[in-house]
């Protein structure tokens, strides 16, 4: 179970990091090179997600969505210095429970 978690985290870092660089370029006036690097990192995210050991594309991306939410809240705390409120935390917990329901049961 460690390998899928590692892939989810690596994919999340690429998606959030790449998206943030594009945000900086288009919304904060950073140079276009920042945006190009962000785009390249986002492309890498798409490749990394294919390394998951789960056979179903839809299930992998649905489960990853829950992980992405948690990582986005952590990113907001660390980078943007914006603390999640109780509704953010409750929603994130619900998402992680959903991820576990999707991924943990063995299927025939």
Curated annotation (Swiss-Prot):
Xref: InterPro entries: UPF0060
- List the subcellular locations: Cell membrane
Keyword Membrane belongs to the record: yes
Q: List the record's Gene Ontology CC terms alphabetically.
A: plasma membrane
Q: Which domain of life is it from?
A: Bacteria
Looking at the Swiss-Prot or TrEMBL record, what is one Pfam family this protein matches? Answer: UPF0060
Family the UniProt entry places it in: Belongs to the UPF0060 family.
List the protein's name: UPF0060 membrane protein SAB2216c
- Organism in which the protein naturally occurs: Staphylococcus aureus (strain bovine RF122 / ET3-1)
